[in-house]
Amino acid sequence: MVANTGPLINTFGKLFDDENEIEQAKMQLIGAMDDNKGDIIKIASYPFLVINVAAIDNTAFPTKYLSNVIKDELWADCSTCQKREYCHIFHNQKLIKTNQGRVFDFLSKYYIWETEYGHRMTIRSMTEQLAYMMTGGVECEDIVPIDLHKMMFFNLFFGYVGTIQNAQAQNVLAVKLAYENHFDQKRLRADEDLIIKRSYDELFSPEVVAIIHNAEKTSMFLKGWAEELRRIYFFLNIVPDESWRRDTEDVFSKQYTTYLDVRGGASKPSKSQKMLIIDALRMMYLGTVISNSNTIPITLSKESGIAQSVQLVVGELSVNDIEVISKPDSALNMEKQNLVLRVQKKEEIKLSLPMIDYFEELRNGVISTNIDPQLSHGIESMKAQLLKVVYIDSDDLEMIVLNNNGYEKINIEIDDNVIRLN
């Protein structure tokens, strides 16, 4: 078990005397870590079984772990405890168990989201957060009567005590991360029924409705009450699956549910996902999604994602050569499917969730010049791979000039030191 791969690679290189052998052996070892196939390989006659644990999807762990934690046989003593009527820990266990379908669904979507956005949590981090979600960091002997809603798991998960953010909860890094997402501040299409009409009976079970009514007595007019209602809704709503799917888009992103469908193998990439990629490419290179042409000019441009008014064309990509497919992540992650852009049946480019969400914003005209470095790297890597596929080595120069009506192509000829524009 190696926590830091740098010393492993360097130490392995010291087994060899020849400089070329050292570099070759290092590259083979790095390649094996990237492939993560779980096969025994030989590097310079040394047998290796390389498993890159950090690349193994662990997002299924939280729900499996929590399903064991809430088993009734583990809580038998609590049912006879003198504090059982006001113990938030015991109430959290019962509430989670009664509503585990929706609770597990939200937890799964949340941890996948964090992983896809580069915040892969360790098993330790996840268990810390789930333990805090159950207990709030309070020992049994310290439990005293309190408004129960304040210490319910839907608040503790995000680091709140009722409507108030708990500064001490920020010491649990996974809780701090959940808080900093501010999911509970996002407007939902369910807000009208949840916050304005207060149609609790249509949104929650009678048990949860009772919790909300009791909480309203002291918290209804406090700042942060609407956010607490949303936190309750995330974990405990009983709305139809289609309505919850819609709300999931509001909480996370518009493309998230279709991305999850492909990631989990429930469906193949859709035509709408292909059109999203095509529209995003047009926005990146042409500054508009409107085009009468079946081709997309691939140009040299700066790394801002904003189309320049004048660009040098290095090739063209036919929309018929664009496919969006799904492929297994790796031999050790067979249940996880990656969304892949395939160009001309040969070049394959992995599409991450941040890239998909960025494409959605780009298509809608939302241009950001301050994007995450990891996302920026993914976009520029894709552009470089597209350039490799479509590049044509030619003496002819072609430019595109963007205007209010779209763009026009200009051919440049250089003959006897004279430049001609056609």
Each model region followed by its residue ranges:
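An almost-null, non-specific background feature
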Residues: 6-11, 16-18, 38, 57-62, ...
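Extended alpha-helical coiled-coil/bundle linker/stalk regions that scaffold oligomerization
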Residues: 66-319
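Aromatic-enriched hydrophobic runs in primary sequence
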Residues: 40, 45-48, 53-56, 192, ...
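Extended charged low-complexity segments that act as oligomerization/scaffolding linkers
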Residues: 1-102
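C-terminal domain/tail detector
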Residues: 230-422
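Detector for Asparagine
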Residues: 4, 10, 20, 36, ...
